[in-house]
Each structure stands twice: as C-alpha cells, then as structure tokens.
Amino acid sequence: MITPIAVVGPTASGKSALGIELALRLDGEVVNVDSMQLYRGMDIGTAKLTPEERQGIPHHQLDVLDVTETASVARYQQEAVADVEEIMSRGKTPILVGGSMLYVQSLVDDWQFPPTDPAVRARWEARLAEIGVTRLHEELRARDPEAAAIIENNDPRRTVRALEVIELTGQPFKASQPPKDAPPRWGTTILGLRTTADWLNPRIELRTHLMFERGFLEEVEGLVRDHGLIAESTAGRAIGYAQVLDALAGELTLDEAVERTITGTRRYVRRQRAWFNRDHRIRWIDADGDTTARALDILGR
C-alpha cells in the first residue's frame, strides 16, 4: 500500500535534498509544503531547488501564485490534498517537503477550518488600521500566547484571522487545530530533521550570504519592477524579501538587510522547533548524519 512520506524540520536543515533522494529511491513525486515557494519568481530567497537540482522529479505546489496574490492555508490544503491523492492513484509515492508549520498540519491532518464572519473580521481589520500590526499582535499575545508564538508579529492577515477565530469559537486558536496525536492523514510517515543551534546557525549565515552573492537583491528588484511585489503583500513580508524591500526603500543598508535576514531566520527556526517538537508522531533524524540512509531504515526500505 502506498502512503505519503513527509519531511519536516527547520529552515536550512536539508529537507529539500532529502526529499529528492527519497523520491529518486521510492519512485516518488514532491509536494511542496513551504508557503513562500508557492510564489513564482521567489527562487533565491526561498532556497527553491533549481530545475537541475530537482533531477527530473516532478514537483507540485511550486510556482503556483503570483507575488501579488495572498497565500491561503485553506486553499493550499484543498489543492495539495488533491495532488497527493492523484499521485497515489498513479502508483507513485508523495513526498511532502517543507517547514511551513500550518501548511504541514493542514496537509497531514484533516483540519476542518473554522468559519469566517465578515462582520467580526471587519471589526478586527478596523482595529488593525487603528493601532497597527505590532500592537494588534500584542493583543493576540495577551489573549492567546500560543497563537502569538507561531504567527509573525508583522503578519497582519494571520493575526486578524487568529483573533477572528478566537472570538467566533470562544476558545484559543489552537483549539481549532486537530490534535497532534491523531493518526496522520493517509497513514503518512512524518520524518523530522533534528538540528542543534551550533550546527544550524552557521548554515543559516552561509546560506544567507550566498543568497545575496547569487543575485537575491536583483531578484527582488525584478519582482518589484516586473511583477508588482510590494512590502505590504504576503510575499513581501517573507523573511529576506521584507529586509531587501526595506533596503530598496532606503530604510536599511544592504549589510543591515543581510544581518536582519539572518536574525529573522534564526527567530523563525526557534518557532519551527517548538512547533514540531510538540508533534510526537515525528520520527526524528539527525540532520548532520546520513539522513537518506536513516530515513530508509525508518521506512523499512
């Protein structure tokens, strides 16, 4: 029986490379679970594999949005579930690869999203316009510290959505999410790459510097000029892209943009670790070892 394999873990831990190796060995196809790799043209700053690095492995949910569009977990879930089931119908193994926490959970769990209420949302959006995203995020933290811990304090859309759900349900945002001890959808095996700060932090620094050496600034300039990328968009708030946009606006030097990208990535990694460590279904693999051999051993292949 074919069942999916998920490869999760923090940024820069080697998920994409392991995903390719598993797909090559298990006749698989990759389903992207990185919310920023959904965007066309956001390549260098998201460490998206090049066509050559994909080694002929089909990739799904990659380059499906323009940078002016808003990524939606609910829409992603609907489309990615269809991709996974279509892959299995052809006798192939879906390899789910990424570290976007809510997107991972939407795919491996049968998450029924809470309803929306236009009046409630409008009230919170008015509050956002009145006090700004930073103070609104502080209000979320006061109401639901766990929700605030997984939502960036510069993400107005998700902050508003969390407050809307809390008001509509009368419960913490987490209560609307499926439990992490339930059997994963399709019997998915979830593999996690375990990292230490001493090992991962230098990789984050190296990767960030290489991004800029390989033309990250020019990538962002092109997205602004040719595709309408703006700082207020979902894509424009991505780590790295937000900092470069600030540099292009004269609010940061390029060196400051590099350093803030590094610190922003480290902060995001801490949230990823906290999130994934709470999921006891994950089979952990040390990222600094032979991850392919260990993964195949866990899978009994």
Swiss-Prot record:
Pfam families in UniProt: IPPT (PF01715)
SUPFAM superfamilies: P-loop containing nucleoside triphosphate hydrolases (SSF52540)
Reaction(s) this enzyme catalyzes, per UniProt: adenosine(37) in tRNA + dimethylallyl diphosphate = N(6)-dimethylallyladenosine(37) in tRNA + diphosphate
Binding site for ATP: G9, P10, T11, A12, S13, G14, K15, S16
Region annotated Interaction with substrate tRNA, chain positions: 34-37
Positions marked as site (Interaction with substrate tRNA): S100, R121
Chain residues that bind substrate: T11, A12, S13, G14, K15, S16
MF-aspect GO terms: ATP binding; tRNA dimethylallyltransferase activity
Alphabetically ordered keywords of this record: ATP-binding, Magnesium, Nucleotide-binding, Transferase, tRNA processing
EC number: 2.5.1.75
InterPro entries in the cross-refs: Dimethylallyltransferase (IPR039657), IPT (IPR018022), P-loop_NTPase (IPR027417)
UniProt cofactor(s): Mg(2+)
Enzyme class, spelled out: transferase
Annotated GO biological process: tRNA modification
The organism's place on the tree of life at top rank: Bacteria
Purpose of the protein: Catalyzes the transfer of a dimethylallyl group onto the adenine at position 37 in tRNAs that read codons beginning with uridine, leading to the formation of N6-(dimethylallyl)adenosine (i(6)A).
Self-association state and partner proteins as the record states: Monomer.
Family: Belongs to the IPP transferase family.
NCBIfam families hit by this protein: miaA
Stated name of the protein: tRNA dimethylallyltransferase
Gene name of this polypeptide: miaA
